[in-house]
Amino acid sequence: MHIYVDADACPVKKEVEQVATRHAINVSIVSNGGIRPSQNPIMRIIVVDKGPDEADKYIANAIIAGDIVVTADIPLAARVIENGGSAIKHNGEIITENNVGNILAMRDLMTDLRSADPFAKQNHKQFSKSDKSRFLNALEKLIQQS
């Protein structure tokens, strides 16, 4: 088992490191730059080319069945699931075969609604302590299931 983190704008890198260290699981932090290296030997920083979806492409090509990917990118999560991996969002939501279709459809609907009203105010929810707690519990659950 290996954990991959789609690291751009990911607020749970330290939490992944804590859980992975406890379970002695290697982690790859994939980004197109700007990530501080960890002194922890299980942590590996992978810098990909700049450009849209470069980190996603790397992760999708690298994972094997049983790996876990931390990402908020739903199309990447769908590819992970197709390849036998597990996907978890940084708020603790586990993306599965059963819910990925609905999540993709909702994402597409929301994209269409936002483009229909370019003046609509973006309402990005702040990452909270309860999100962090949900994430830690869900990651622990995924690891124990694997």
Kindly give the residue locations of the regions a language model identified.
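Nuclease catalytic cores that cleave nucleic-acid phosphodiester bonds
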Residues: 2-146
